[in-house]
């Protein structure tokens, strides 16, 4: 009954106005699944390959027609007739069909679109929501949002070197109340920036990109806004950073262009430790460059016992890189981006590996998103307890928050908001 009978892909437009891949899957019983693929701005060197056409005369070279054709031809031929419920077999077939270690032949964007739409179709065939189909009866934990309200780095045109400054409403009783707190703080911050004559236009992920000189300047604005909105920093709301340090790691040092300062890996670790001591920062993502294993070890040894250290570029949701990082004692948390690895099965494998090793996992969007809300369901399915899906602006970000609100309502009394327990340092 769940045999795949039709596969169709198309080019659609993502939140940055660039083409991306959308895939429709139809099953023998009429069940239907659709998934759209996200795209990153700051990408790790070890991510699975997102295939772009490169034809400068169309979409400025960013078209994905080749990936769409791969789905409609090779991938369709390979998976039509297979059972959608056999997710791991289908994903293994897609990996084998591509035949490269980084999914570079067919494109991770082609493969992921097929993989996720298969899961959605199978869930519909079972008459189950996606989170329940993937996660089973134990899927009931609503994640704490990491809300990106000030942007710098590759996500902004300002001097701030760090890429994201986030709030986490850990003290809220429910996911809905966490979203409300985030919204109130977001609007309070907007007024504070406006009153100081700073820009309040929003970036790719819905956060502000004011012309501030340094990370402490951004953190001070956020702290004041939390308090003005009626919340207590460190209790109701804590802070998180995404340094995206790979972007400014040059010749063995961290070049803070905005501050005019260069820091060695040891000095970088000291700087981050100092920020975490001065502010209620409980999570730091990509605090070191993706290849600076020595720096990661220094940072983990220094503050890993009290701060969540999230590997994004370091691990790229890749079970092999994660296994090596666990073995070497690098970081203590995995950022999960489905398009970094390219199939649902490998994504779930990485999350399971992290959780077995005592690492936390954070489900994440990309800077180029669509209305697709799959990651909201996956956050609940895996009980990972944390999600990064942008600020409280832009419908491509709010689609995920709104889906989480619906899931919380649907779960009713069995819903559990992760709160402070999501981060071991706060437990």
From Swiss-Prot:
GO terms for cellular component: cell surface; extracellular region; phosphopyruvate hydratase complex. InterPro entries: Enolase, Enolase-like_C_sf, Enolase-like_N, Enolase_C, Enolase_CS, Enolase_N. Pfam families: Enolase_C (PF00113), Enolase_N (PF03952). Pathway: Carbohydrate degradation; glycolysis; pyruvate from D-glyceraldehyde 3-phosphate: step 4/5. GO terms for molecular function: magnesium ion binding; phosphopyruvate hydratase activity. It catalyses: (2R)-2-phosphoglycerate = phosphoenolpyruvate + H2O. Its cofactor is Mg(2+). It is found in: Cytoplasm; Secreted; Cell surface. Mg(2+) binds at residues 242, 285, 312. Its EC number is 4.2.1.11. The keyword Nucleus does not apply. (2R)-2-phosphoglycerate binds at residues 163, 337, 366-367, 388. One of its GO terms (biological process) is glycolytic process. Binds a second Mg(2+) ion via substrate during catalysis. The active site is at residues 205, 337. Keywords: Cytoplasm, Glycolysis, Lyase, Magnesium, Metal-binding, Secreted. PANTHER family: ENOLASE. Belongs to the enolase family. Catalyzes the reversible conversion of 2-phosphoglycerate (2-PG) into phosphoenolpyruvate (PEP). It is essential for the degradation of carbohydrates via glycolysis. This is Enolase. The lineage of its organism: Bacteria, Pseudomonadati, Pseudomonadota, Alphaproteobacteria, Sphingomonadales.
């Amino acid at each position: 009954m769940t045999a795949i009978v039709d596969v169709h892909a198309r080019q659609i437009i993502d939140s940055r106005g660039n083409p991306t891949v959308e895939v429709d899957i139809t099953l023998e019983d009429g069940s239907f699944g659709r998934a759209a693929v996200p795209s990153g701005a700051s990408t790790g060197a070890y991510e699975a390959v997102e295939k772009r056409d490169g034809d400068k005369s169309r979409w400025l070279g960013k078209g994905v027609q080749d990936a769409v054709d791969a789905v409609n031809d090779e991938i369709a031929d390979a998976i039509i007739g297979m059972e959608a419920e056999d997710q791991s077999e289908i994903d293994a077939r897609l990996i084998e069909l591509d035949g490269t270690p980084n999914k570079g032949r067919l494109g991770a964007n082609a493969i992921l679109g097929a993989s996720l739409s298969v899961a959605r179709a199978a869930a519909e065939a079972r008459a189950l929501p996606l989170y329940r189909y993937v996660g089973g009866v134990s899927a009931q934990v609503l994640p704490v949002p990491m809300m990106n309200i000030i942007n710098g780095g590759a996500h902004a045109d300002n001097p701030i070197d760090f890429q994201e400054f986030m709030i986490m409403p850990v003290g809220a009783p429910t996911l809905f109340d966490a979203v409300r707190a985030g919204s109130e703080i977001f609007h309070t911050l907007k007024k504070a920036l406006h009153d100081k004559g700073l820009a309040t236009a929003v970036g790719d992920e819905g956060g502000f990109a004011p012309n501030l000189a340094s990370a402490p300047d951004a953190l001070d604005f956020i702290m004041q806004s939390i308090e003005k909105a009626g919340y207590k920093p460190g209790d109701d709301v804590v802070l998180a950073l995404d340094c995206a340090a790979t972007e400014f790691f040059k010749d063995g040092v961290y070049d803070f262009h905005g501050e005019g300062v260069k820091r060695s890996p040891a000095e970088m670790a000291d700087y981050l430790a100092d920020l975490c001591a001065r502010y209620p920062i409980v999570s730091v993502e990509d605090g070191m460059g993706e290849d600076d294993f020595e720096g990661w070890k220094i940072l983990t040894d220094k503050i890993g016992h009290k701060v969540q250290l999230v590997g994004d570029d370091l691990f790229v949701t890749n079970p092999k890189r994660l296994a090596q990082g666990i073995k070497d004692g690098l970081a203590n948390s995995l950022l999960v981006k489905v398009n970094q690895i390219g199939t649902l099965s490998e994504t779930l494998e990485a999350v399971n590996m992290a959780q077995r090793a005592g690492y936390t996992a954070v489900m994440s969007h990309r800077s180029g998103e669509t209305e697709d809300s799959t990651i909201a369901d996956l956050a609940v399915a895996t009980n990972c307890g944390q999600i990064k899906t942008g600020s409280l602006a832009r419908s491509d970000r709010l689609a995920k928050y709104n889906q989480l609100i619906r899931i919380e309502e649907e779960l009713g009394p069995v819903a559990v908001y992760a709160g402070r327990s999501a981060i071991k340092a706060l437990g």
